[in-house]
Amino acid sequence: MFAKLEDIERSFMDLEQELADPEVYNNQERYRKVTMAHAELGDVVAAFREYKQLSADLEDNKEMAKDSDPEIREMAEMEIAEIKDRLPKLEEELKLLLLPKDPMDGKNIILEIRAGTGGEEAALFAADLFRMYSRFAESNGWKVEVMNSNPTGTGGFKEIIAAISGSRIYSMMKYESGTHRVQRVPATETQGRIHTSAATVAIMPEAEEVDVQVRNEDLRIDVFRASGPGGQSVNTTDSAIRITHLPTGLVVICQDEKSQHKNKAKAMKVLCSRLLQAEQDKQHAEMAEQRRAQVGSGDRSERIRTYNFPQGRVTDHRINLTLYKLDAVIEGDMQELVESLISHYQSEALKQQAQDG
């Protein structure tokens, strides 16, 4: 681990030198990339430097603890105790900082909540979940924008979709995907019986706008004379353009303009629009598949968490965590729940890393 940390520190110092280089500073794209790389390594380098400093201080204090002056010895022993308490914690921090980063962690999210088993009660629960997430977002300074909703007449939602934007949202919210189960007595229940309902939650990183990269070698451009009704030639010059995108087989023809250059520009614009749409369709298909994998069918048995109102508890079944503060959680006080999930999955990743060597 420490050899890897030494390599990271060297890379960090190289990046610092690059940032001080006027040539890099004057190249906006290069400067942006170097700044991002430098910032990404900042936390781990700071922790490693603290670890090295504390290790050196420990050795110094061990020497001071041999001093003939009892006051110096006492002071050194106090320092040694503090350092020995801090070093193991710092080592654990470093292990976490060395875990591979999820490239999606910094992204905004799309939140989708759908009522599952349980009819109107499930729709009301979906509304409760949306309010819970909205208030949690508000407490973190995030922005929530409803994209689409299918409300019921009693204040529930068959479905609600929202975009949530802010800082590192996906890293905190990604473990919310799955089936959430509620156990409570519905307002319409006259016998006081507890009903079980469910809603599914999908958390997806918000897709960036797709940049269309069209390489010249991927295009075949043919020029020909524009034709009018009945195939007659309406132009004596080869101004019409046919562009074929070889990797996809998409073909665009433009012959409205008398200028070949204008026809080519129009055809390229149409081609790029079609390629962009095709890429977005592909992303949507992948997102739909991801959603299916995440949330299951909405059946009560496929649960990640249970909200039991009569007992005032919320239980996350993945990490066997039960909190007896359901009222606070459902009002958006989710920090303990979220941090426990992050900590659990970080521990799992550390175990996996140790097994992989």
UniProtKB/Swiss-Prot annotation:
Post-translational modification: Methylated by PrmC. Methylation increases the termination efficiency of RF1.
GO MF assignments: translation release factor activity, codon specific
GO CC term, one of those recorded: cytoplasm
Keyword Cytoplasm on entry: yes
PROSITE patterns: RF_PROK_I
UniProt keyword list: Cytoplasm, Methylation, Protein biosynthesis
Segments traversing the membrane: none
Compartment(s) where it occurs, according to its Swiss-Prot or TrEMBL record: Cytoplasm
A Pfam family it matches: RF-1
N5-methylglutamine: residues bearing it: 232
Function: Peptide chain release factor 1 directs the termination of translation in response to the peptide chain termination codons UAG and UAA.
Family to which the UniProt record says this protein belongs: Belongs to the prokaryotic/mitochondrial release factor family.
Protein name in the entry: Peptide chain release factor 1
Species this chain originates from: Maridesulfovibrio salexigens (strain ATCC 14822 / DSM 2638 / NCIMB 8403 / VKM B-1763)
Chain's gene name: prfA
